[in-house]
Amino acid sequence: MKPHTDEPLTGGSRAKTRKGSLSRKGVRRCGIVAVALSAAVLLSSCMPQGAVTEKRADQLSVGDAVIAVRLSEGKFSAGLPDPPEDNWIVLLDAQGRGQATRIEAKRYGISTLLWTERGLSFGVPDKEYVTTDQGTQEIDVKQPSISEYQRFLLPDGRIAVVALGEGIRVDTIHPHGRIETTEIPDTRGEIGQCGQHIVGITDTEDSESIRSAAFEAYAAQSGGDMPENVAAVIQIDEPNGDVPRLLAVAPAIDGLLTGRMSVPCDGNVITVLSIQQEDPAAVRNGTRQPFDGVLVLQRWDLTTGQRTIIPVLDEAGQPIETDQDNFLYYSRAIRVGDEYRFVTKKGNAYAVDVTSGNARHLFSIPSEKTRNPAVFQVSETGVYVLEQNDDEDVLTLSYQPWDGGGKRVLLTTGTMSRYLVERNLLMGYRRSIESFALRPGWDGGAQ
């Protein structure tokens, strides 16, 4: 472990309130046929571009914002110069008005947003920001990080920012702005949160750092033949030196791919949706794709150290097959009662009983035809979808309850069009939605 502590800046930067004047020149002419929409629909696609005010990152404040959006780097257009390598953070209120700031992009992974009661958390390689009603706290990161995997809110108010590369790095942001960095070399795996700790699932082939300790722990646990590869649940936020703590071990299963750990553990039991490859040998020699297989649940009991594999079956009792176009590494999931509910990157929603593995297909979210896929967030009641309409450069936020009832539009806005698309004689590019977060307690009338 390579720990160091970053001291906070003295005080947070207070954001200044600036109201942009709206002139007729800024108003975009657009013809919209009035339709009968519910009171929850907040339409602002004809609002002027001046409704979004640009500020420095340290001048942002939450204000009346209900949604925060992080836009990716621009996508290259043939024959034109390379697009800028930066991101935009845009905060919008329910009418599509708000603030925007240009920030440096992280090169690898997906740069996420985390909006908690403490404020909106986001970062760049050398700084972390926490934006509240009072302004933005800017915190220097002494060892810059060019990648990001996920942000987690810990029970005591700390925020953990995880980055993956040749090893695993965790930047823990304390409530008063101090950053504590932990780096574990030669370690890879799928990372998630279990209570107050950050944990991962890996094996001795992917993580050389645990090899000796994992085989020793398995020998003490089983007393039988030693497998060639040992799988393990590890704790990465409080390692033993350069080695993560081992929480459980079991023989590694050939071709078992651990899915994204987006569901918190239930007590001492971790349940992760995973893929069992149909033919691992064919994958290794290149004749099959890595995601050709079937869905399973991987359950680890940290009290006993035991792992159980549960097949996931559809309503007809058949395995659910996966392939390159229908896999779960970009799924969003949540635990609701005894069910693991998730939505795939293509908008297919399922519920899986965590004990039996019986699955139900809940719905498929109708999506606009677009070059940029929709981005999802989940709650205990349903799925929030943020989509980008390529033809009109409009963003639409909608909601689909888990128990049915149809897709409901919550907000439509064109005020971000100049940040989504750049068209001129010298440059042309399009940005996509990298991530978004909703203000805690705001549902847009979805419930």
Feature map (PLM): residue ranges:
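N-terminal export and membrane-targeting signals
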Residues: 16-37
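Surface-exposed loop/turn elements that mediate protein-protein interactions on large endomembrane-trafficking
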Residues: 48, 79-108, 124-146, 163-186, ...
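Short beta-strand elements that form the blades of beta-propeller/WD-repeat-like
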Residues: 59-82, 112-125, 150-164, 190-223, ...
